[in-house]
Amino acid sequence: MWIKICGNTNAQDPQLAASAGADAVGFVFAPSPRQVTPEQVAAIAPQLPDDLTRVGVFQTRDFDEIASTVRMAGLHGIQLHGGLDLSLIDKLRAEFSWRQFLIQAISWQVDGDPMESEQRFLNDLGAVVRHGVADALLIDAKTTTASGGTGRTFDWKHAREVLDSHPTPVHIIIAGGLHPGNVREAIVTLRPWGVDVSSGVESQPGKKAPEILEDFIRAARFAFLEIEPGPMLPVEAPPV
């Protein structure tokens, strides 16, 4: 089980996440109400526990920009959004070897034709699995106007059926519209390796609500106890 609290903009929220039992925290370097700079994260990082995985969220395809940010901010993981670029993953793996936990986000479109959404999802899933370099796949909800971070859920039951028919050895992380009231259902339905939440534990964009965050982590932990890892759910933790 792996719980990531994303969209952090200050030192207090990731500290709270760590004390509540989160495994990782995320910092958004893409245009967003929660966007931060490498300098901000570099100042926050020394205030966090050594065993708390720090993940940077990127939408750029600029390798030099990502690599520079990783070093300056002191990150342990790289999360890529905005479509597949397998050559970028190759470059990042070559640059950082296995010192960085690489997460590739793929989307489940929640508007438009359901069959087309499923086929696009399968195409991306297959491409990443065949490529074999990413450590994890993050499944997020997508709309015609936003490729992720929508705060909307996708069809968990349908996604579970698709994943059952296309087993993958890669870690599966789910995101999109999660909050304390629905994270148990999401975990029990999809049986992922991890969950990722941002707006679902906030009092306002970029500011976490302590009670909501703690409730989310507690609900997620209890839900993970209800499921058993299947062959698609390796149990190794990402490097820190």
Predicted segments with their positions:
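Conserved, mostly hydrophobic/aromatic
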Residues: 17, 78, 137, 155, ...
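Basic, often amphipathic N-terminal segments
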Residues: 1-50, 76
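Glycine-rich beta-strand-to-loop/alpha-helix junction loops that act as flexible
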Residues: 6, 57, 81, 172-178, ...
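Glycine-rich phosphate-binding active-site loops on the catalytic face of alpha/beta enzymes
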Residues: 22-33, 79-85, 141-146, 189-213
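A C-terminal functional module that forms or caps the active site or interfaces directly
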Residues: 165, 171-188, 202
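C-terminal helical cap(s) of enzyme catalytic domains, especially alpha/beta-barrels
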Residues: 39-48, 91-93, 198-240
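Conserved anion-binding
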Residues: 29-33, 40, 47-171, 227
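Non-catalytic positions within long, well-ordered alpha-helices that form the structural scaffold/packing
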Residues: 18-21, 70-71, 129-130, 187-188
